[in-house]
Design a protein with these regions (language model features):
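A well-structured
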Residues: 1-203
Length: 203
């Protein structure tokens, strides 16, 4: 008689799945499509209003701009997290793979529209920024965030190079990560006479 302790006992194949419904119900969710369209247009509107003007804003106006930037970033994070976790949960599904790739490309375009903001913020002189912070209680709320952004100030490249590096991310590092995932999916391992994927074998 075969028992659970027997080497011939069937391996458990049911792996746990993430419940991502707090983010979106599915890759075909209407809410997801609306949010992606919304953040796309919000980013374009943000760029149209503030690009090449960040250094001219007073403290309260800069705080309001940061709040709008933060809203875009949070929505991008929600969409990106859902896409990444959905893909990680089933890298073998070609439909999910295509969804993940398309979402990454669209979010990259949104990020490109927003890229100018942190770059221009870092161009503000230290004394000028200190004055803005002193005169605006609203801006003081974002002091830790501004400090963290400006840590990278000495290493900032020209706007053109920063934009180019950002645009190439989908075809660069991100593409290599996806290639690794797809390669791992294609691997099969013989475990007690059964052909298992790497995920099944590890669990």
């Amino acid at each position: 008689e075969m028992t659970d302790e027997s080497p011939d006992a069937p391996l458990p194949m049911e792996l746990p799945e993430w419940d991502l419904s707090d983010l979106y119900l599915s890759i075909d969710s209407e809410e997801l499509a609306r949010d992606l369209e919304r953040v796309t247009w919000d980013a374009k509107g943000f760029a149209a209003e503030f690009k090449e003007r960040v250094g001219d804003l007073d403290g309260d106006a800069l705080a309001a701009a940061i709040a709008r930037y933060e809203t875009c970033q949070e929505l991008m994070g929600r969409i990106g997290s859902f896409a990444s976790l959905t893909y990680a949960g089933n890298v073998e599904d070609p439909e999910i793979g295509a969804f993940f790739q398309d979402t990454q490309e669209q979010l990259n375009l949104v990020g490109t529209d927003l890229l100018f903001f942190s770059l221009e913020l870092n161009l503000i002189d230290e004394d000028a920024l200190a004055h803005l912070l002193e005169c605006s209680t609203a801006l003081q709320h974002y002091r830790p965030w501004i400090r963290d952004i400006r840590v990278f100030r000495p290493y900032q490249l020209s706007d053109e190079l920063e934009r180019l590096l950002h645009e190439k991310d989908v075809a660069g590092r991100t593409a290599w990560v996806r290639l690794f995932d797809q390669t791992m999916v294609g691997l099969r391992f013989d475990v007690e006479g059964r052909s298992l994927s790497s995920e099944e074998a590890l669990h």
